[in-house]
A protein has these predicted regions:
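N-terminal glycine-rich phosphate/adenylate-binding segment common to multiple enzyme folds
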Residues: 70-102
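Alpha-helix boundary/capping residues
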Residues: 58-59, 78, 154-155, 159
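A short glycine/small-residue-enriched secondary-structure motif
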Residues: 46-52, 81, 103-108
Length: 203
């Protein structure tokens, strides 16, 4: 029998506020942020303002995928809340292993608790808006089969986020662009428009 009460799962890179997430039955798996003084959970005990402050001080925090334990705990919380199915839309697999982590957990859960996991091929605004649109579709009564077979793939395929950055320094330090590209862009004062390639990496 197809799930009737459907929850949504995403990760902290969707940049959804706690209020928006709670209002829309969206559960968040926090990525880990590795800093000089320890490990933090994104959006839980470290926030964007903290990260920007560290960057300005010369530190380069690194992201890491959530632990299997934390992802499993969120799924257990969803089940305990009375939901009987989950649609998960995760950060682009070209940037993180979060999608594959949740996919493996979903495979282990079997058919007893259906979890359909999608690679957003996106992040931040693109990922978050996809999840919010699915929340609206669920409120409007869209059924499980339509959501997982058609609607979610359509939303992902039709989402094209573009963004720019003030400096190329952190993209270079994080390994997202090469040193030559970053140096040339800085010297020429170029601020490129960045988006996601079909493989989910930044281009």
């Amino acid at each position: 029998m197809a799930p009737q009460k459907i929850a949504l799962l995403t990760d902290s890179c969707a940049d959804l506020s706690p209020r928006l997430a709670a209002e829309n039955h969206i559960y968040i798996v926090p990525l880990r942020i590795l800093c000089a003084d320890g490990e933090y959970s994104d959006g839980v005990d470290i926030h964007s303002a903290d990260i920007y402050r560290r960057l300005k001080a010369g530190e380069l925090p690194q992201t890491s995928l959530p632990s299997a334990e934390s992802a499993g705990a969120v799924l257990e919380e969803i089940r305990d809340a009375g939901f009987d199915g989950v649609i998960a839309v995760m950060l682009s697999s070209g940037l993180s292993g979060t999608y594959n982590l949740v996919r493996l957990i979903a495979e282990e859960s079997g058919d007893a608790f259906p979890i359909k996991v999608f690679d957003s091929v996106s992040g931040s605004l693109g990922q978050g808006l996809t999840v919010l649109q699915l929340a609206e579709d669920i409120r409007n009564g869209m059924d499980w089969e339509t959501l997982v077979e058609r609607r979610t793939p359509q939303l992902i395929a039709g989402t094209f986020p573009f963004f720019s950055v003030d400096t190329l320094e952190y993209l270079m330090k994080g390994g997202r662009i090469g040193k030559v590209t970053a140096t040339a862009g800085t010297l020429l004062q170029i601020k490129p428009i960045i988006t996601f390639a079909p493989d989910g990496q930044l281009q």
